Amino acid sequence: MIRNMVFDIGNVLMDFRWKEYMRSLFGEDETLIQTINQGIWHNGCWAAMDKGEMDGAATLRSAVAFAPQYEKEIKLTLDRVALAFHKCDYAIPWVQELKRLGLNAYYLSNYSAFSVEANPGVLDFILYMDGGVFSFEVKAVKPEPEIYRCLCDKYGLKPEDCLFTDDVPANVKRAKACGFQGIVFEGYEKTYPLIMKALR
């Protein structure tokens, strides 16, 4: 019997619109955007922040070292990154609905301290949840098995009593391998009824 609903956060309970954000800063300058993306994302900085191995200052230094000609633009990108995070209007009502059904609601997310501090307001749904795990807190990221075990150990959960949803199929596949039930999140309109049917 499922007693616990476990959510990913990014692009599930909160939208992370990086491409839209970058175009709002730099228009259609694809060379600039691709270079900054390379310096922040593809060299592993963002993933290292998610894992608690780097902070924002270290990411800035690394990205600037990769593309010193764009130092000003890289700093602007990181300074205004809060604008890439957007609330989902359905997040709090959904969590509240689960609570009314007598279920527990948790989060399990690849998320950095930098992102939490950049825009804490988009995480307001957490106040209505029973808890959760951010990857930076435990130095493990999905789909590493350790992060799923960390959630269960922290709250005394049995994996078979948990339903996990994430927009990344590999993360759901790993959750299932760890004993969770799982549904890939493919947008609220499509996935909400599937999850609620599985929970009832």
How would you label these PLM feature ranges?
Residues 20-21, 44, 58, 62, ...:
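Alpha-helical elements of Rossmann-like donor-binding domains used by nucleotide-donor carbohydrate transfer enzymes
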Residues 46-77:
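A metal-dependent, Asp-based hydrolase signature
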Residues 8-11, 52, 98, 107, ...:
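Generic structural signal for small/hydrophobic residues in well-ordered secondary structure
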Residues 1-41, 177-178, 187:
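Active-site neighborhood of HAD-like aspartate-dependent phosphohydrolases
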Residues 1-7, 112-113, 117-200:
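Asp-based, Mg2+/Mn2+-dependent phosphohydrolase catalytic module
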Residues 57, 74-106, 145, 188:
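Short, acidic loop-to-helix structural element flanking the phosphoryl-transfer center
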Residues 28-38, 67-79:
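Short, surface-exposed acidic
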Residues 22, 40, 59-64, 78-81, ...:
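Hydrophobic alpha-helical core bundles mediating ligand binding, dimerization, or RNAP-core interactions
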